[in-house]
Amino acid sequence: TVHAADAEQTNPLQFYTGSNNSFAKATLQVEVGLFDQGNSWFGNAREALGEDSDSWWESIIRPGLEGSYFLPNTQEIYGQVDAVQANTGGGLDAAASNADLGDVSDLRIENAYAGWRSGNLFSSLGENFLDISFGRQQYKVGDGFLLYSYAGSGGDRGAYWIGGRRAAEYAGIVRMKTGGLNVDLVYLENDPISNDSTELGGATVNYTFNDNASIGGGLYTLDSDIDSRDGMNVFDIRGGVKPFALANGPEALRPLRIDAEYVHEDRDDGFDAGNGWHITTSYQFEQVAWQPTLTYRYASFDENYDTLFYGFADWGSWYQGEIIGEYVLGNSNLDSHMVKLKVQPFEPVAVSLFYYNFTIHDAGDFGVKDDAYADELDLVIDWSVNDHLSLSLVGALAMPDDGATEHTGGDDDWSYVMLYGSIKF
C-alpha cells in the first residue's frame, strides 16, 4: 500500500510532487535468481520429475506507477498499478513447474488498486482511522502463516522461486485503526494457475499493547471450487510477547520473545477439520558483538490442514527450508523443528544459519512407513548494497531419512546454491 512518506524527493523516477506532499512516480523492480544443485530429489530427480533438474535461472521485471493525492483534513487518495514480466530459462526448476514447457516468459498485470485514507477527518479516533482499498492487491496478516500470497507462480507464469505473482484477483479491504486496535474487514478472490478459485471473506483483529506484547486473530469463511475448501470456516489466533520486558524483569532476560499462532479449519460435508500451529522463541544477545539472535521454532500441521495462502515474509517463514519447504513439502501433514542463528557482522550484511528437522505428521496418510523425512542446513547471506540494490547468497544441504527415501526413491544428500539480486526504485 502506498504511503506519502514512501515518496522520497530524491527518487529519480518521481515526476510529480505537490505542495501538500502529493506525489506521482514511476516504479521499477528487477529481480534475478541463478540456481544450481547436485543430487536433486536426493539423487532421483529423473524418476521423481521425469527429467533431471540441475540448474536454471529466473527473472522478473516489474514496471509500474504509484501516486497519492491529499484532500482537506489530510484525507488521501492513493493507488498503484504495475505489471510483471516473469521468466524461467536454462533448465527444469526443482519443482518441475516448467516441465514440458521449456523456457517460459509471461507478462501480466500484478497490482492494480486504489484507496482512500481518512486522515484527520475522524480526529478523535486518530490519524487515518479509516482506510478503504479495492482492486488487485496483496493482503498480509502477521508473518504470512495463513494469509499472504494469493496468486500462483511458476508453470506457464514463470519465475517459480522469485514468485512475482502475489496479488489477489480482487480484494476489497476496510482497515480501521485507533490506538493499539486494528480491525480489518476483507473480501478477496485468489488468482491460482488452475481454474479452481477460492473466495475468502472475514475479519482480522489485532491489538498492540506496546512494543512488548500484541494479540490478534481472525475469522474467515470460504467459497471455493475445491470441495475440501468450499464452506470452510477458518479461526486464527496469534500473539507475541517479551514476558520479562513486559514485567520489568531481569535486564538480561528482557530480549527474550515468544510468538505463537494457531489455526483451526472447520469443514462440512464429511471433511475432517484441520489444525496448524507454531510456537517460536527468540533471544537477541544485544551486548555481544554482531548482536546474534538465536531462534527456535516448532511447527505442526496435521494431515487435514489446508495451507491456504501462506507466503514468504522472511527466510524460513513460511517456506520452511530452501530445499524441502520450497520444492518438496508444503505446510500440511508436516511437523518441523527449526533452529536459526542470525548475526550482523557489519551494517549492510546479515548472515543466517538454519537447521531443520522434518517429520511427516501422519506417515500412513502420506503413503510412507517411516515418518522421519529429512534434515536440512541452510546458510543465507544478505547484503544491502545501497537503498536500491540487494544481494543474497544461499547454500543448502538436505539429508534424507527413510521417509524421504521411500517417498522419492533417492538416498543421496541434496545440495543447492542460489544467487539472488534485486534492484528497486
Which sequence ranges carry the predicted segments?
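Beta-barrel outer-membrane channel/assembly domains of diderm bacteria
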Residues: 2-132, 172-178, 252-257, 263-272, ...
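Surface-exposed coil loops of outer-membrane beta-barrel proteins
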Residues: 35-39, 46-51, 92-105, 121-229, ...
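A general secondary-structure junction signal
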Residues: 83, 136, 298-300
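Well-ordered beta-strand positions enriched in small/hydrophobic/aromatic, beta-favoring residues
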Residues: 114, 201-203, 235, 417
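Active-site beta-strand termini and strand-to-loop segments that position acidic
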Residues: 117, 207, 241
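A short local loop/turn or secondary-structure capping micro-motif enriched for an aromatic residue
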Residues: 191-193, 223-225, 303, 360-362, ...
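Long, internal scaffold/assembly segments composed of regular secondary structure
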Residues: 212-214, 221-301
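Short acidic/glycine-rich loop or secondary-structure boundary segments that cap or lie
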Residues: 267-270, 301-315, 360-364
